[in-house]
């Protein structure tokens, strides 16, 4: 059984202005299932962007077909650029940004991924300008040791430190290469993550360097008692997509600034048979199968968890005055949905009701008419449905926006009269968030572009 543990997506690995992958989460999941993989792990280049899409997509598939997808496990990881502060801050040696895979075993592990990625991006922004974001050994050590046992480490591709040390040692003495530095580094990483949470990584490839590394990893795995796994570092979906991926990589500068050829020949999602077809030429089928089966060790170590958080809208009552009972009695039949807000247990709902009633009363020529009542009905209904669907009160959001706009004007600054879909939501005009009446516009705008009861989502 096999799970692909090293994969890149277009949504995550291309975020740094560095063209990398053409994979989509949906197609990867579908193809992984077609190949009988037991799950999918996303490990974009220092980006956690695609994880929420992966978890949501698997959740939706399980809702449609629970039996088919119940054991298909989504796993979240990150391919970092591991280095020392000396390399970057003192030597300014940006070639020593070594690839390394981190995989979250659980929610605590995912929080550690977030901490490390945040530090890496901050160091990238304030230390030097580079499309690769450094994760320093010191930071990795600190975060992992704070709560040990929640992250899995894997040695990644040919861009990793141990691979470079293997190739350098071999080139120095091909007859009797000294891999002691590699062994020292691997032992240190195994100790850092905890034995059983660190894996050596092989990849199928026709490159001589990768074949050499795979052979040495086999020896070191046995010698150091560190298991190895086989990954494909997927940047595109299928073998026949190779030319499309190459054209994508060349689309910005024709590939002048990077290698776009040989390395990527085998970086696609593979079946077990395809992996064997590449690797059985220099390893035994049994040795290859061990690397395939060992991916299930990672599968078993990883729990499933949700990244969803409750939507919390902060609300401060700038005016705590309750709505007037007299005004409510006057307008409740004209705008029946006001009852929901007038009788609500939430302050923000009642305060918004107050604002609406006051506007209806203060500007009778503009607001006391049937088109206004109809527009209010549509807007209030959309807010009620959306608030219930998301277990929050969107009235609080609108009242805070109202105060922000008011503050801008009172400070003597300028604020745009409105933009986008909000320009069609009549209630925003009554709350003075936008500066024009949508009902008077010659070009018709629609409230449902901003919020609709059948599309209960976060507001613009």
Give the location of each predicted region.
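Domain-core and long-helix interface of multi-subunit machines
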Residues: 1-42, 46-70, 115-241, 348-400
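Acidic, His- and aromatic-enriched active-site or binding-groove loops in soluble protein domains
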Residues: 73-74, 78, 99-107, 220-229, ...
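Acidic/polar active-site rim loop that often engages polyanionic ligands
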Residues: 85-101, 115-118, 272-274
């Amino acid at each position: 059984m096999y799970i692909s543990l090293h994969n890149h997506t277009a949504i995550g690995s291309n975020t740094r202005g560095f063209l990398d992958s053409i994979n989509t989460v949906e197609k990867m999941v579908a193809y992984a299932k077609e190949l009988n993989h037991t799950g999918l792990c996303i490990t974009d280049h220092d980006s956690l962007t695609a994880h929420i899409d992966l978890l949501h997509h698997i959740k939706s598939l399980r809702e449609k077909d629970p039996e088919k997808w119940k054991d298909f496990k989504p796993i979240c990881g990150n391919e970092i650029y591991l280095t020392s502060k000396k390399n970057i801050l003192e030597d300014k040696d940006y070639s020593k940004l070594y690839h390394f895979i981190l995989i979250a075993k659980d929610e605590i592990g995912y929080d550690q991924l977030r901490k490390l990625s945040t530090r890496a991006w901050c160091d990238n922004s304030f230390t030097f300008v580079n499309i690769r974001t450094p994760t320093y050994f010191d930071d990795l050590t600190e975060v992992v040791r704070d709560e040990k046992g929640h992250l899995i480490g894997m040695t990644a591709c040919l861009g990793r430190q141990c691979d470079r040390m293997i190739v350098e040692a071999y080139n120095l003495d091909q007859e009797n290469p000294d891999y002691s530095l590699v062994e020292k580094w691997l032992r240190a990483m195994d100790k850092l993550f905890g034995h059983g949470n660190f894996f050596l990584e092989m990849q199928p490839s026709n490159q001589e360097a990768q074949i050499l590394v795979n052979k040495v990893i086999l020896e070191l795995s046995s010698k150091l008692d560190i298991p190895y796994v086989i990954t494909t570092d997927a940047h595109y979906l299928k073998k026949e997509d190779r030319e499309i991926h190459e054209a994508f990589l060349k689309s910005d500068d024709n590939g002048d600034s990077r290698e776009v050829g040989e390395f990527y020949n085998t970086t696609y999602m593979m079946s077990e048979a395809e992996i064997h077809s590449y690797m059985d030429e220099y390893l035994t089928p049994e040795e290859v199968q061990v690397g395939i089966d060992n991916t299930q060790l990672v599968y078993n170590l990883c729990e499933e968890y949700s990244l969803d958080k409750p939507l919390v809208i902060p609300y401060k009552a700038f005016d705590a005055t309750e709505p007037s009972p007299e005004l409510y009695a006057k307008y409740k039949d004209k705008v029946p949905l006001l009852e929901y807000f007038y009788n609500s247990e939430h302050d923000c709902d009642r305060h918004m009701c107050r604002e609406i009633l006051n506007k209806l009363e203060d500007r009778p020529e503009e607001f006391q008419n049937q088109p206004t009542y109809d527009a209010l009905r549509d807007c209030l209904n959309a807010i009620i449905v959306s608030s219930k669907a998301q277990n929050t009160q969107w009235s609080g959001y609108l009242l805070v926006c109202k105060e922000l706009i008011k503050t801008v004007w009172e400070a003597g600054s300028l604020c745009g009269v409105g933009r986008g879909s909000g320009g069609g939501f009549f209630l925003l005009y009554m709350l003075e968030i936008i500066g024009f009446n949508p009902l008077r516009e010659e070009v018709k705008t629609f409230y449902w572009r901003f919020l609709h009861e059948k599309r209960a989502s976060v507001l613009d």
